[in-house]
Structure formats: structure tokens, C-alpha cells
A protein has these predicted regions:
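Conserved active-site and SAM-binding loop architecture
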Residues: 1-219
Length: 219
């Protein structure tokens, strides 16, 4: 497992080269989780209340879009490189294969998982929807409470948190293995706490239970 975090800025060419090199390996999974504060419901409210800060809010989306474009570019380069390294049938992936989702592209594409909170507005923007179509991604629900996501502060401390993610991936087998939804008939809504305060930022971190399931599903 190789993590690309805030220290590995996607604005730097060195980061892109390192990422492309990793993705050349035969069995790789690319879990894409980008800063998405610009699309969260709270940001939408703040934009309405603080129109004088519109340039700041717009910058969030500009950065998100740029980083997704960079990841998309690296995925294409890696897919082409993987096909050339394999060279088992003399057929290489081309840019045209990627854009048209040909069987050649599907054969050499790494496992791709794109994650955003379910209610994040970035799911609705054109360039994210285009990325999903281009990479043949299917959406799956991922409810944090089923992976023991609990509050750590205030009245929510120790309670399960109502946090919903959606993952879009190009493997139905993998997606179905990590997908999970809260069942109201088993888990009472009263057992949940809303994400707020200090817990809001911290829920951006995955639980150990979720990380373990991701690794088991990919193994």
C-alpha cells in the first residue's frame, strides 16, 4: 500500500511521475479521494451567506477539478504503459481505446475507486460525470456506521455517526464486497449522531474496519 497524501501534491510533476510508476505494476488499485470541501452542503450554505468570499469558494472547485484531471491523465498513461509491458498479444492501449472503453482498455486498466461523500455536489458536475463514464465506473453505497464510524467529541462521543460515502469503481466484484448500507430495522436511527463540530473534519479519515475490508476485497 503506497499512500499519496497532502505531502504528495498533485500540482507537482514529480508526484505524477511517481504515481504513474506505481500504476505500471500488474496488480494495482487506485483509490481516489480528493479534497472536496467545495462540494459539501455546509459550503453551499456558506456561499449563500458570504457572497463576498465567492472567489475562495470557487478556488476549491478549481483545485478539485485540476487534481482529478491530473489523476485521469496518469491513469491513461499507466494503462498504456501496462499494455506495452505485457505485450502478450502485440496490441497496445491507445488514447482512443480509453475514450471509447474498448475491450483492450478494460483488459489493462487498473482497479479504480473514486470516493466522495454521497451528498457532495461534485457528483453532479459535468467533468466528474464524464470521468465516471470514461472510466466505466459504477456507484456503490458506503455507510460509515456499518464500519464502526463513531463520534469522538461532545454529545456524539461514542455514538455511531450518520456518514454516507459513495464509491464509484470499475469492478462490480470489488464494489459489491465493500458496499454496505445502514439497515433501519437492525440499527435504530436513535443510535446515530449527526456529524458536526470537530467530528466533521475527522470523518474524512476512514475507520480501521473499512481499511481492512478494502484490503481483503482487493487481495
Amino acid at each position: 500500500c503506497i499512500r499519496f497524501t497532502l505531502e504528495d501534491d498533485l500540482f507537482y510533476e514529480s508526484t505524477l511521475r511517481n504515481l504513474a510508476e506505481v500504476l505500471k505494476e500488474t496488480k494495482t488499485m487506485t483509490w481516489i479521494s480528493l479534497p472536496c470541501i467545495g462540494g459539501c452542503p455546509y459550503t453551499a450554505l456558506n456561499r449563500q451567506r458570504n457572497p463576498q468570499k465567492e472567489s475562495k469558494f470557487a478556488m476549491y472547485e478549481t483545485h478539485f477539478k485540476f487534481m482529478l484531471e491530473q489523476v485521469d491523465k496518469v491513469l491513461t498513461e499507466a494503462c498504456i504503459a501496462r499494455s506495452k509491458m505485457a505485450n502478450d498479444d502485440g496490441i497496445f492501449v491507445t488514447d482512443n481505446d480509453v475514450y471509447n472503453n474498448t475491450t483492450t482498455y478494460v483488459k489493462y486498466a487498473p482497479l479504480i475507486v473514486f470516493e466522495l461523500p454521497t451528498k457532495n455536489s461534485y457528483w453532479t458536475v459535468d467533468y466528474v460525470q464524464a470521468f465516471i463514464r470514461k472510466r466505466c465506473l459504477t456507484k456503490f453505497p458506503l455507510h460509515g456506521c456499518r464500519y464502526n464510524l463513531r463520534g469522538k467529541h461532545g454529545i456524539a462521543k461514542g455514538k455511531l455517526l450518520r456518514k454516507e460515502w459513495t464509491v464509484a469503481c470499475n469492478s462490480h466484484n470489488f464494489g459489491s464486497r465493500i458496499a454496505t448500507q445502514c439497515n433501519p430495522s437492525i440499527c435504530s436511527p436513535s443510535e446515530h449522531a449527526r456529524v458536526s463540530g470537530k467530528d466533521t473534519k475527522e470523518t474524512g479519515n476512514y475507520t480501521q474496519e473499512l481499511a481492512d475490508q478494502v484490503h481483503r476485497s482487493f487481495a
